[in-house]
Amino acid sequence: LSIISSGGFLPVNRIDYLFDSDISKIFLSFTMILSFFSLFLTYNLIFYNKKKINFLSEDLNLLIYLLVIISFSFVFLNTSNNFPSILVAISSSISNIGISFSDTPSNLIFMFFIMVIIGGSFFSTSSGIRVIKILSLIKFSINNLLSHTKPNQIYSNKVTLINENTEKSDINKYFFSIIIFIISLFILTLLLTLSEINFEQSFKLSILTIMNTVNSSMFELSNFDFYNLSLFTKVYLIIFMIIGRVELLTILILFKKFLFKN
């Protein structure tokens, strides 16, 4: 239940006690990946139709993104022959679950945080900015740069494997959601720093809080003491968890409809 819902709850204090073999770690990785893909993936695969291939386009992009990360990690990062643990950390990061093993390399922390921020599918239990948003913004940015060199040429904002063109209004929403994330990250980091938590821990904890990801050893926050936090600190951590899950952009759109009906 914890894995399906992208939760990080464990029946024991350390996950190492539950999965001690490489096979079990690989199996755990693939089960966590399920929450990275769309909730409708199983349905779309069962009732597959060539006319409805566009419904699988986001998941195909996610699969390519996942395979690139796994291949890169296996070739370049598997220096200590602990790839199963790295695979668990990758699966846990992209699905915003956050659990990891104690032998996960600490020098890969930046990569894990980037994957946590990117997140997974629009229609998944994971959090993050979402892969398609990132791809759409990259495509739009490249087209804008190319339009200055070849102004007479028409450029499409279609993302690879997606038939529909990304509208300018959607691009604006995607960009605005990233701005909101940056502002939220800055505010929460500032609040945590004012609560006498050092800047590094405040910054890491802010990312994980906004992205609804459990802190663990791969983020070097496994020993962070939440119990002794002040009431106000716990309250605004909860508030930013809700903002990260619901997305502040959605809340602003709802308020706009109520406040500016005309």
Question: Which positions does each model-derived feature cover?
Answer:
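Membrane-proximal intracellular helices of multi-pass ion channels
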Residues: L1-N262
